UniProtKB/Swiss-Prot annotation:
GO annotation, cellular component aspect: cytoplasm
Lineage: Bacteria, Bacillati, Bacillota, Clostridia, Eubacteriales
Gene name of the record: plsX
Classification via InterPro entries: FA_synthesis, Phospholipid_synth_PlsX-like
SUPFAM superfamilies with a match to the protein in the record: Isocitrate/Isopropylmalate dehydrogenase-like
Top EC category: transferase
Catalytic activity, reaction form: a fatty acyl-[ACP] + phosphate = an acyl phosphate + holo-[ACP]
Protein name, as recorded: Phosphate acyltransferase
Amino acid sequence: MIIAVDGMGGDFAPELVVEGCIQAVKEYEGIHIIITGKKELIKNELDKREYNGNKIEILNAEEVISTNEAPVKAIRRKKDSSMVKALELVKEGKAQAVISAGSTGALMAGATFVLGRIKGINRVCLAPLLPGAKAPFMIADAGANVDCKAEYLVQFAMMGKVYFESVLGVKSPTVGLVNIGAEEEKGNELTKAAYKLLKDTDFNFIGNIEPRDIPRGEVNIAVCDGFIGNTVLKTYEGVASNLFSMLKKEIMASTRGKIGGALLKPVFKDFKKKFDYTEYGGSPFLGAKGICIKAHGSSDAKAFKNAIRQAKICYDKKIIEEIENNLGNLIENNI
């Protein structure tokens, strides 16, 4: 399997991108990586780490898409950017997956306009996995589509279901519709229409769920439009970050707290690991005609390595073909 990695995307590019790629080719069998970006910079990082293997190559790209550029314009105008070059490798069949920690908006535009959508899929959705009390959960969509139709949400649910079943090995994952109340009649026109459609599918649909129920692990796939999904995601990240800061402050405020904190250090370490985004790799753009993984902007080497592992599993489990097959089932049932 060949994986295209945007070597210039993210806060720590290209240093930690290269480090993550080296770790991945050493750990995972059957992968070859093409790093796109400024050749001299990437080669210097490989040389620093004394890598002289044949599982990593460089494709030169002189331009970089920054996070403050208009996404669609950047993808269309910066043809010699590291992100576009990586996407084009997948489009041309020279790679089977693309990974970038660069601009989320630009990668979304690239997934749509460079890779294209799977035939029959209305919108590509961003579907991150997050740690829950019982097990990881997915938000679909987490910001790619702020305005949606009910049938889009059904497709998001289907693609999330495929990911859980194929990639994570979870049979019959639960699907919940994010809403302001659990009752069927709650919500706006979008959620009411989506509820009716989801109820008619063969998904394990448990009905409406309130945002507070999501981190409890009450559902595997939380379905919503991108505006709601991104709000839930950012709130969740903010609460988790502040929780650790507040806890640390309280522990350090007294001698008793410091002693208790020292005794509970292994527990806190394990607890913090559950909230470590690097464990999850990245967020897949589901519905694109190619495997596309968005790594966190501040990804370290471990996060890149795990994003590469994630892309490999998606490829091995034939996630694109599985989405196509499941889409056919929806169409047959007029949904």
